């Protein structure tokens, strides 16, 4: 797993690409592109399997966790997908999901988020979960 600290402009670039309706290839390309860009900029990449504790820690530090999930459970689509986690408690996780009609503060269970993160390997052949943590500017 990669945990990546990136700048806000990198997140905007992801959002702009995904907002244009590009799909699976963009999600896969963007993750590779960001990792390469991060390495070149000297950002710290932590090779570990991110979990809900990493997401909770980021939220506690007022940081923005972006998580790549697989869309099968949430949207019945066979594609990787980026979401932003906005809140978490003992039972639920709140996400901003640009693919969802509601968009903001979509509530999912903790177990469903873990499953969607794990489904990346099962359905998309992405070897590891991907979590990007951005600092608020």
Describe the role of every protein-language-model region.
Residues 2, 73-74:
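Short, catalytically relevant binding-site loops at active-site mouths
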Residues 64, 82-83:
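Structural motif
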